[in-house]
From Swiss-Prot:
Keywords: DNA-directed RNA polymerase, Nucleotidyltransferase, Transcription, Transferase
Lineage of the organism: Bacteria, Pseudomonadati, Pseudomonadota, Gammaproteobacteria, Candidatus Pseudothioglobaceae
GO BP annotations listed: DNA-templated transcription
Function: Promotes RNA polymerase assembly. Latches the N- and C-terminal regions of the beta' subunit thereby facilitating its interaction with the beta and alpha subunits.
Self-association state and partner proteins as the record states: The RNAP catalytic core consists of 2 alpha, 1 beta, 1 beta' and 1 omega subunit. When a sigma factor is associated with the core the holoenzyme is formed, which can initiate transcription.
Family: Belongs to the RNA polymerase subunit omega family.
InterPro entries referenced in this protein's UniProt entry, alphabetically: DNA-dir_RNA_pol_omega, Pol_omega/Rpo6/RPB6, RPB6/omega-like_sf
Disulfide bonds: none
Protein's recorded name: DNA-directed RNA polymerase subunit omega
Amino acid sequence: MARVTVEECLEHVENRFELVLVAAKRAHQLSSGDYKPLLDAGKDKPTVVALREIEAGLIDASILSETYEMQEQLSAQQK
């Protein structure tokens, strides 16, 4: 597991507060099982996977603007 730094994650979000919101939402998506990791999760917990995805530029603040309906549609498609 590579170390995830806040500074590297901040290249993809505006500030630390937004980073917390984005990481929390993504970690919740991963832990619910409705979404699959975009990177190899290995034995990492959802929070670490979320931060690694942000650091890699795969997830950004646009995740915060998703509506409930969009989430429901994605969940239905993945099942």
